[in-house]
């Protein structure tokens, strides 16, 4: 019934596209008029549009004419004219939606339409790509159009100076990678002046490969970190012990990706730990003093049994480097958190880098939701449309192709074993190679791609291998995958964003010759050669894409298929599967193997059966649903931190912008003075209950006040009068500092102290939230909702953080001393710039350089003294306590607050 209705009325997508086609006629009707304009008149249209906007017109009022102007400019400058379907894509992007356009349909050119239109407001447009190569390529090629129309273009890549970045972000249109944008946002919110920041306020972003950025990478936060204590020796010892465990000592579940020790394993490992003198002979692994070892053992177990070299990570130049499971690319600088990366380093016997504490972090989910207007484009988004709508409020519209798709997608071939599957793939590759048909073979890991490469080498079939180990050559290799007799092996979607043209990509071949002085004479020769090869390739059947396994996500499979058949080109795709494949082995029904044998599957024979195809699709849907729930759950928890992050960042910006910090200083002084007095002189209490001795100690600790006991000798004195006296004494101390150092210097010092204190308590708060998050799921066993509990406790921690901020800020202001001999006007700024220079960012836990500050306003940037989980603190060993909040109960279990016990002299 539903299919009949769809045929009668069309899908919602069909109706949207039909409506947009009616909009295109209005743009097309302007084309003859725009074509008659001279270059100068065409350029002046930008000035005219800006003037209209200044006088109250909206972007929609000038949309049709602006699109027509961009189309004509692209034709004159680049020799490319936007097709009608590309205009539709531009309209979808301008309306803040995601456009799904097949590979080769010219998404890069589509982005010029909404980018130009929205840049006319002067608020900036960000065009976001997945790597530096694409950002540089697109800004250079499309920048010609923008420059022709009088708009400025910037490009952000890794390694640029702040000055260069600031100029690029101030351009009308900025091309940048998602990683650099996120890190620049975090870095900006760690700077000490508005002038040092590089980003402008958020306006409009167009995300290329939007599914990769908003879905595949959504679970990995951007993190700026600093080191905690060095435990490399312990990681090495634990690794040595875990290597001695045998089958039966632990159980693992590949489906749920979990691993744990059995009772037998616990007994065995306790014996090994005792032999290495890591635990006492008479103690157990789960005794209180040994609980921290459980974490190290679990991570070592995961490293040895759940993570494989050349599949999940590479070892290069003495470093463990993570491989992106979706793209097969090395994720430069990214490190696994919670000690897993250190466990992998111990496993691979490379230098173990320190664990790190989070200083700042954000997920792409929350970063991109900062933009008032967001849009994106990709070749595969429909399968993820519900998630994109639910999380980002982005609708997906599939745009029809300019030319009809002639690619043939063949049925999957299923074999009993991996060897039989590879034999069939090899047979097909040989056949295609002999006929000259180019082949692109997609694998799911570096290990599999190198395995297949060795098979082809034995058969003496020349080929190119494209994986994370050779990512520098990625774009060039993939661009030439359509040449006559080309055989290319690629991990998943390596090279995404680069078109595979039948016969080869002439532009990239010409680029390779650019260093040769005689290259111009060879251009015509190259173009003629490519044209000849294209004819041969089309006769051979176009690009044949072979999938060696099904991915967990249907979308990744569709992306691989989409490499063939661009712009109406012929082509074929086919997946080869075996019962040994991970998806079949872990997720598909166990009945499949029996069914295949029943159907008479013989060695070397393939089988096609609808039930198997359905089972595979259900397995993929199950995994996709599971991953979606993980991302959605991550967002629910991250939203709690995001709300707090917004408050802190807004407060930090206000502090930086403020010309006077005295209001906050005075109000906080009064608040703390009242709080301290009432703590030791409770309202309504008798004089004999007043603790004047400890009141004096606390006032000196916080305000550096020498309290006069005679103030309380009067019989009729009240706590209000004492509070007023304390506030006045604090005010006098501050005034004396002002007289000694100057008002301007004190103002700068107070602002700097406030910012550094805010950064310190926020850093500690992030650490507390990390620990809270790690164990919060266990609340479910107590019939409590983990999310509700996390929200409640995170709020309490946030309030405690604000209390700590006030106390530390006031304490520092009233106690600090400046050595005027060494103070320069720019000292504060210079110290912070040095700090920023030594700071590193990554997708997870980068190293953080030690830094010793100069002699003015001493800044202690030693490795972070981190907060320790209370259950891991030894009451008799203060060195095991880590950082303790002054308002916490003292870990020695005296029952007193830390600030009145062991922290009294801290």
From Swiss-Prot:
It is an enzyme of class 7 (translocase). It catalyses: ATP + H2O + cellular proteinSide 1 = ADP + phosphate + cellular proteinSide 2. One of its GO terms (cellular component) is cytosol. This is Protein translocase subunit SecA. The keyword Nucleotide-binding applies. Its cofactor is Zn(2+). Gene3D superfamilies: Helical scaffold and wing domains of SecA (1.10.3060.10), P-loop containing nucleotide triphosphate hydrolases (3.40.50.300), SecA, preprotein cross-linking domain (3.90.1440.10). Part of the Sec protein translocase complex. Interacts with the SecYEG preprotein conducting channel. Has a central role in coupling the hydrolysis of ATP to the transfer of proteins into and across the cell membrane, serving both as a receptor for the preprotein-SecB complex and as an ATP-driven molecular motor driving the stepwise translocation of polypeptide chains across the membrane. One of its GO terms (biological process) is intracellular protein transmembrane transport. InterPro entries: Helicase_ATP-bd, Helicase_C-like, P-loop_NTPase, SEC_C_motif, SecA, SecA_CS, SecA_DEAD, SecA_motor_DEAD. One of its GO terms (molecular function) is metal ion binding. Keywords: ATP-binding, Cell inner membrane, Cell membrane, Cytoplasm, Membrane, Metal-binding, Nucleotide-binding, Protein transport, Translocase, Translocation, Transport, Zinc. ATP binds at residues 86, 104-108, 499.
